[in-house]
A protein has these predicted regions:
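Short conserved segment of the HATPase_c
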Residues: 15, 152-164
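Conserved C-terminal segment of the DHp
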Residues: 15-27, 31, 35, 83
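Short alpha-helical segment of the dimerization/phosphotransfer core of two-component systems
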Residues: 38-43
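Helix-loop junction within the histidine kinase core
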Residues: 54-65
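Short helix-loop "hinge" at the ATP-lid/N-box region of the Bergerat-fold HATPase_c
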Residues: 121-122
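Short alpha-helical Gxxx[C/S/T] motif in the catalytic ATP-binding
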Residues: 177, 181
Length: 212
């Protein structure tokens, strides 16, 4: 129910904003601000997914290609997501191991896909780590996001990139994020996939063309 998905974080933002205005306790204020920020991020992702999916359905999702530094995108995404990780989860990226390369692609859309995969991993990982990296394989770049979360059954893997499919119905989200990721990567002449076993985490990966 899309309206329910939107109302849930919106109600949290409104409710905790009202409480925040009434409390003088510093620790309570800090906790309420965190809750408001978390739900604001969720609401933004929900709205972005809905708008992008609408553009996909209309055939007007835009792309703008440019020479792009993947390492810069990875640095930015680490800064964005590191402080948002669950309490017992570490975000890991070995920047020294990342090759300094430029690929001709859409930096905005590639960033969107990486951000979505990291956010998804955080949603289903209660403890352990989420690592993301890329490496050059002949003819393309392979980008990976690997987590130590709950894992995904083979049944779900076969439909996970379909629209409105959710791994866990109790988790918030539109069920459109991975559909949008697949559409973007295929439009950029790449492929996307997942490898996982229940209880053993998941590895999401995608490729982008690279000519050296």
């Amino acid at each position: 129910n899309m309206s329910h998905e939107i109302r849930t974080p919106l109600n949290a933002i409104i409710g905790f904003s009202s409480i925040l205005a009434e409390t003088d306790d510093k620790e309570e204020k800090e906790e309420f601000v965190k809750i408001i920020n978390k739900n604001s991020d969720l609401l933004l992702r929900l709205i972005t997914d809905i708008l992008d999916f609408s553009k996909i359905e209309s055939g007007i999702l835009d792309y703008s290609l440019a020479d792009t530094s993947l390492k810069e995108i990875f640095h930015e995404q680490y800064q964005v997501h590191a402080l948002k990780m669950p309490e017992k989860v570490s975000l890991i990226c070995d920047f020294d191991a990342l090759p300094d390369i430029l690929i001709h692609t859409d930096p905005k859309r590639v960033t969107q896909v990486i951000s979505n995969l990291i956010s998804n991993a955080a949603k289903f990982t209660e403890e352990g780590s989420i690592s993301f990296s890329y490496r050059i394989v002949e003819g393309y770049v392979l980008i990976e996001v690997i987590d130590t979360g709950i894992g995904i059954s083979l049944q779900h893997q076969q439909s996970i990139f379909d629209r409105f499919v959710k791994i866990n119905s109790f988790k918030q989200g539109t069920g459109l994020g991975l559909t949008i990721c697949k559409t973007i990567i295929e439009a950029l002449n790449g492929t996307i996939g997942v490898d996982s076993r229940p209880g053993e985490g998941a590895r999401f990966w995608f490729t982008l063309p690279y000519n050296g």
